[in-house]
Design a protein with these regions (language model features):
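Helix-boundary capping/turn motifs
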Residues: 1-7, 24-27, 48-49, 91-92, ...
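EF-hand and EF-hand-like Ca2+-sensor regions
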Residues: 56-113, 117-178
């Protein structure tokens, strides 16, 4: 369980967009404000994306709460995981599919470096040099990562309790690239 908690803690730091130690509506609002600008979305596209991102935050992260601390976040994930491991895996596969289907707006079913950098900036990560190195850990084919592969990598990161299995997201965090 310690291995998973370490990974969940890393994820918490990504979700804590303003880096104040707590996930709150301010983190949600930051992503809702920044994403349409970063992607250059039309007003109609922005409204749809904002609605879907807001729903994602409420469904998978805040779950009706106004804020969540890291210990609460870890406890919540541990409770879900120990209660029903298969349901937990299914939930977080859906979680990452849902968010990647929103934030990769060009509908190519692949993530380019440009997509990756823009999406990372939405989460408060602005160092493009580190983001480029992080992107390269995914070993993109012709400069692209298939969305399904990326989504599966994140689901694996959150749900896999075996430290001997390859985990590109964990490698990204361990290398200090996010």
């Amino acid at each position: 369980m310690d291995f998973l908690k370490k990974k969940w803690s890393y994820w918490f730091t990504t979700l804590d967009v303003n880096h104040d130690g707590v996930i709150t509506r301010a983190d949600v609002d930051s992503t809702l404000r920044d994403f349409p600008k970063l992607e250059g979305l039309s007003e109609a596209e922005a409204k749809l994306a904002i609605k879907r991102i807001d729903k994602w935050w409420n469904m998978y992260i805040l779950k009706g709460r106004k804020k969540i601390s890291e210990p609460e976040f870890l406890k919540d994930l541990e409770k879900q995981y120990t209660h029903d491991k298969e349901a937990f895996k299914s939930t977080y596969r859906a979680c990452f599919y849902d968010i990647t289907s929103v934030i990769y707006t060009d509908h190519t079913k692949s993530i380019s470096l440009d997509n990756y950098v823009k999406a990372s900036k939405m989460w408060g990560h602005n160092n493009e040099m580190l983001l480029r190195k992080s992107f390269d850990l995914y070993k993109p084919d012709h400069g692209m990562i298939p969305i399904k592969e990326y989504s599966d990598d994140w689901a694996n990161f959150i749900t896999n309790d075996d430290p001997t299995k390859p985990d590109v997201v964990m490698e990204t965090y361990k290398a200090g690239l996010v």
